[in-house]
Amino acid sequence: MPQTLFFVTSNASKLAEVSAILAASGISVQSMALDLPELQGSIEDISKDKAKRAAEAIGGPVLVEDTCLCFNALKGLPGPYIKWFMKDLGHEGLVNMLAAYEDKSAQAVCTFAHCEGPGKEPVLFQGRTDGKIVPPRGPAKFGWDPIFEYEGQTYAEMDKAAKNLISHRFKALEMLKEWMEAHP
């Protein structure tokens, strides 16, 4: 099933992770950087809207991704707005958001939307990983990886290959691969 997906991202770390996860399936990923306005709403609405806009912009099939980090004590915040919270507060600020709460549990959520082209309805693939928010540990190379702990290690402390077998992104991409095999 060798195929190429046009993945709308300007995040080199995200591109590398997606490419690594899909490589064994014979799916290659080409990055396309588009500056798309982001709808405010649920991660599903945001992902669908982004996929439709991207498909219109390039006139063909696209793959887009949106990631959430949901703190259970805050009823899902920062959720789909994690990029902006991360930019403004950093790792320590995110950890401090939970200082008054005993519950440090969180969920990493990744939603991919694949759209066949202009006017088509996107298909969603969502992966979730439960963990907890901890003070930063490990290299601060990729988003909030240093503060999201899964089974005793933060994503940042994990070997990339190990992370790519359990992450929210991996789970969503597994669903995408299954769908692509069923819809060649």
Swiss-Prot record:
CDD domains: HAM1 (cd00515). It catalyses: ITP + H2O = IMP + diphosphate + H(+); dITP + H2O = dIMP + diphosphate + H(+); XTP + H2O = XMP + diphosphate + H(+). InterPro entries: ITPase, ITPase-like_fam, RdgB/HAM1. GO terms for cellular component: cytoplasm; nucleus. It is an enzyme of class 3 (hydrolase). ITP binds at residues 9-14, 50, 66-67, 83, 142-145, 163, 168-169. Homodimer. Pyrophosphatase that hydrolyzes non-canonical purine nucleotides such as inosine triphosphate (ITP), deoxyinosine triphosphate (dITP) or xanthosine 5'-triphosphate (XTP) to their respective monophosphate derivatives. The enzyme does not distinguish between the deoxy- and ribose forms. Probably excludes non-canonical purines from RNA and DNA precursor pools, thus preventing their incorporation into RNA and DNA and avoiding chromosomal lesions. Belongs to the HAM1 NTPase family. This is Inosine triphosphate pyrophosphatase.
